[in-house]
UniProtKB/Swiss-Prot annotation:
GO-annotated biological processes: ADP-L-glycero-beta-D-manno-heptose biosynthetic process
InterPro entries registered for this protein in UniProt: Bifunc_HldE, Cyt_trans-like, PfkB_dom, RfaE_dom_I, RfaE_dom_II, Ribokinase-like, Rossmann-like_a/b/a_fold
Oligomeric form and interacting partners: Homodimer.
UniProt name for this protein: Bifunctional protein HldE
A GO CC term attached to the entry: cytosol
Enzyme class of the recorded protein, top EC level: transferase
MF terms in GO: ATP binding; heptose 7-phosphate kinase activity; heptose-1-phosphate adenylyltransferase activity; phosphotransferase activity, alcohol group as acceptor
Gene3D superfamilies for the chain: 3.40.1190.20, HUPs (3.40.50.620)
Pathway entry: Nucleotide-sugar biosynthesis; ADP-L-glycero-beta-D-manno-heptose biosynthesis; ADP-L-glycero-beta-D-manno-heptose from D-glycero-beta-D-manno-heptose 7-phosphate: step 1/4; Nucleotide-sugar biosynthesis; ADP-L-glycero-beta-D-manno-heptose biosynthesis; ADP-L-glycero-beta-D-manno-heptose from D-glycero-beta-D-manno-heptose 7-phosphate: step 3/4
Protein species of origin: Campylobacter jejuni subsp. doylei (strain ATCC BAA-1458 / RM4099 / 269.97)
EC number(s) stated in the UniProt entry for this protein: 2.7.1.167, 2.7.7.70
Residues annotated to bind ATP: 191-194
Active site, renumbered: 259
């Protein structure tokens, strides 16, 4: 799939709030003598494409032939966008082009200074006419709304109506609590907070998620209904609710992740990719982006690299793991086992375990430990091979090998929040249960076990 997509160059039109993201990198190592505030010494500045322009950059990085339509002011930021984007921009005199200046110190954002004009544009009719003139040449349209006055109700309704008449998919990254101006679009990509505001729901937990996502589809006549759920992935409603789980390994900065999601979805729909597969690829793109700092674009090569996991990076000693966990404010899930011949039952079990928290740690019995528990003929695979196989799964965050007969010492050392065991432990004592906040028992898939697989192989000889 990635190989096919990386060779495509679909023509995609993007309209919306084009901005400039400026990063001012500073040294903040002293306090001002004038007041109890930090002194920021500027080291360098980095001007980047932001808002709809970042979606443009993502689409271009993916290989699309992108064309931008928008309205900018007669200012330096407007000139920067015109110089760096292929497209046509209407100039509204006196209007401020959105400019966000992020003050960065020690890889942390400490302040943001915004220059912008959020009033509705005066050039609605001209923008609609320009769209009508260009639209027939494109495979998909993206409306990137940051509530800066470009995508007014009049503009949105006219653009969606025209594209729909030509059977061209329209994808919208919405803003605000009133989604009615986007009615008839192919899909919207609100995050959880935006969806809650539009739906007037208190939460989107449990059954409310399906009710809410279905209501969005029906109320706004969408082809597909999508809600991005941050670390929980992407929820999709076509004929039923499906969840494409998130795949981020490390999160440094969520800036621009939504732009990457809609860019990948647009690229995929322009090439006829099935919608759930498109959501899975969008998740992978977001995972790449949140591992970087600032508004950045993503390419198919980076997505390919993300899928090629460096197994050894996820295999840690308990000491390394404890240091890493101290740096994260995450819900830690722990399970353990021999995992000698990894099978379908193991995969489903670990996938379910991951859903219970943020970080899944698998405690793996060492070769010596497996021999004690299973006999001299085991393990079939070495501890390193078994650790690599487990680390290959995106839902496993870390693997730690232990020599003891039970994981009690390891659990005491790491102090996870949730301890997961198989449902066969229902009437048994779970080692480490008194150390953790919660024990969860997960049903195994029927008919799968390492012992049975070994017996089957022996019988065939």
């Amino acid at each position: 799939m990635l190989e096919f997509l990386s060779q495509q160059k679909p023509k995609i039109l993007i309209i919306g709030d084009f901005m400039v993201d400026n990063y001012t990198w500073c040294d903040c190592s002293r306090i001002s003598p004038e007041a109890p505030v930090l002194v920021a010494k500027t080291l360098k500045e980095d001007k980047r494409l932001g808002g709809a322009a970042n979606v443009y950059a993502n689409l271009k990085s993916l290989g699309a032939d992108v064309f931008a339509l928008g309205v900018v002011g007669d200012d330096e930021s407007g000139k920067f966008l015109q110089e760096n984007l292929k497209g046509e921009f209407l100039i509204q005199k006196g209007r401020k082009t959105p400019f966000k200046n992020r003050i960065m110190a020690h890889n942390q954002q400490v302040l943001r200074l915004d220059e912008e004009d959020t009033s509705e544009i005066l050039l609605e009719n001209e923008l609609i006419a320009l769209f009508d003139e260009k639209i027939k040449d494109f495979k998909a349209v993206v409306l990137s709304d940051y509530a800066k006055g470009i995508l007014t109700p009049k503009v949105c309704k006219a653009l969606i109506k025209k594209a729909k008449a030509l059977n061209i998919p329209v994808l919208v990254d919405p803003k605000g609590s009133d989604f009615s101006k986007y009615s008839g679009a192919t899909l919207l990509t609100p995050n959880k907070k935006e969806a809650l505001e539009a739906l007037k729901f208190e939460n989107l937990e449990g059954e409310n998620l399906e009710k809410g996502i279905k209501k969005l589809k029906e109320d706004f006549a969408l082809r597909y209904s999508i809600i991005t759920l941050s670390e929980a992935g992407i929820a999709l409603f076509d004929k039923s609710l499906k969840i494409a789980p998130a795949k981020a390994l490390e999160v440094y900065d969520v800036t621009g992740a939504g732009d990457s999601v809609i860019a990948v979805l647009a690229f995929c729909l322009a090439n006829g990719v099935e919608i759930f597969k498109a959501c899975e690829l969008a998740n992978e793109a977001a995972a790449v982006v949140v591992g970087k700092i600032g508004s950045v674009s993503v390419s198919f090569d980076e997505i390919k690299s993300f899928n090629r996991v460096d197994f050894e990076k996820k295999i840690k000693s308990k000491e390394e793991l404890l240091t890493l966990l101290k740096q994260k404010d995450k819900k830690i899930v722990f399970t353990n086992g021999c995992f000698d011949i990894v099978h379908f039952g193991h995969i489903k079990y670990l996938e379910k375990a991951k859903r219970l928290g943020d970080v899944l740690i698998v405690g793996l019995n060492s070769d010596a430990s497996v021999k004690k528990l299973k006999g001299e003929s085991r393990p079939v695979n070495s501890e390193f091979q078994r650790a690599c196989m487990l680390a290959a799964f995106y839902f496993v965050d870390f693997v730690v090998i232990f020599d003891e007969d039970t994981p009690l010492e390891l659990i005491s050392f790491l102090k996870p929040d949730i301890l997961v065991k198989g449902a066969d432990y229902k009437d048994k004592i779970v080692v480490g249960a008194d150390i953790v906040s919660k024990v969860e028992l997960i049903d195994f898939e029927e008919g799968f076990s390492t012992s049975k697989i070994i017996e089957k192989i022996k019988d065939k000889k």
